[in-house]
Regions:
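Acidic ATP/Mg2+-coordinating residue in the GHKL
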Residues: 68
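Short helix-loop "hinge" at the ATP-lid/N-box region of the Bergerat-fold HATPase_c
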Residues: 41-42
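Short alpha-helical Gxxx[C/S/T] motif in the catalytic ATP-binding
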Residues: 99, 103
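Conserved glycine-rich
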Residues: 112-113
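Short conserved segment of the HATPase_c
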Residues: 73-86
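Short beta-strand/loop element within the Bergerat-fold HATPase_c
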Residues: 48-60
Length: 133
């Protein structure tokens, strides 16, 4: 449960009020995928950390970014993060490694992509793009 994790670790979530974005897709499955990415960021944030969300759109795609201020991904894990049942070197919790794979499948089924990378000043970032028809 995300709210339990937020309270337990005293994590803040920052989402700017940039207005609305629109895309063609399944809202419930998209929210499931976004929550999986947010959970990953929360689990890898230090107590008192911040998880950030940003979003924008252009004529080609809608873009959502979710990032944290944790240690980032182990570089050797990045190519495998979205593989089913893969648990990275810095894995926490008792997951079995399907959350990120599920998120990727959900976005790909909606003509989208999800990538993961380390931020220059520390932390990990997920970048989602859902393309227009």
């Amino acid at each position: 449960n995300l709210s339990d994790l937020l309270r337990k670790k005293h994590i803040s979530v920052e989402i700017p009020e940039n207005g609305c974005i629109e895309f063609s897709g399944d809202l419930e499955w998209t929210m499931e995928a976004l929550m999986n990415l947010m959970k990953n960021c929360m689990e890898h944030s230090q107590s008192g950390g911040i998880v950030h969300c940003g979003y924008s759109e252009n004529p080609l795609y809608v873009e959502v970014r979710i990032w944290d201020d944790g240690a980032g991904f182990d570089p050797e894990d990045i190519p495998h993060l979205f593989d089913r049942f893969y648990r990275g070197r810095r894995a926490v919790g008792n997951g079995i490694g399907i959350g990120l794979a599920l998120a990727r499948s959900i976005f790909e089924l909606q003509n989208g992509t999800v990538t993961a990378y380390n931020l220059r000043n520390g932390g990990a970032c997920f970048e989602i793009r859902i393309y227009s028809h």
